[in-house]
């Protein structure tokens, strides 16, 4: 095999690797996280449609006074 063929093979492998890395990076997404604390409600990386927005609007921060403990 001559030097030009080796160079072409190396370039092909590099381009294929770059394409694979980019495509994997584009398909990975963060999970939807809704964190409710005593002070706030935080929504991170979630797809928000109108139904989800309405549901989130009714949430309130966690409060011990509103919790009931049944014996």
Curated annotation (Swiss-Prot):
Alphabetical list of InterPro entries matching this protein: TGBp3
Segments traversing the membrane: 4-26
Topology feature Cytoplasmic, residues: 27-71
Entry superkingdom: Viruses
The keyword Zinc-finger is annotated on this UniProt entry: no
Gene Ontology cellular-component terms listed: host cell endoplasmic reticulum membrane; membrane
Name the UniProt record assigns to this protein: Movement protein TGBp3
Alphabetical UniProt keywords: Host endoplasmic reticulum, Host membrane, Membrane, Transmembrane, Transmembrane helix, Transport, Viral movement protein
Family (UniProt): Belongs to the Tymovirales TGBp3 protein family.
Any one GO biological process: transport of virus in host, cell to cell
Function (record text): Plays a role in viral cell-to-cell propagation, by facilitating genome transport to neighboring plant cells through plasmosdesmata. May induce the formation of granular vesicles derived from the Endoplasmic reticulum, which align on actin filaments.
Miscellaneous remark of the record: TGBp1, TGBp2 and TGBp3 seem to act together for cell-to-cell propagation. TGBp1 is the main movement protein that physically cross the plasmodesma with the viral genome. TGBp2 and TGBp3 would facilitate TGBp1 function.
Cell compartments where the protein resides: Host endoplasmic reticulum membrane
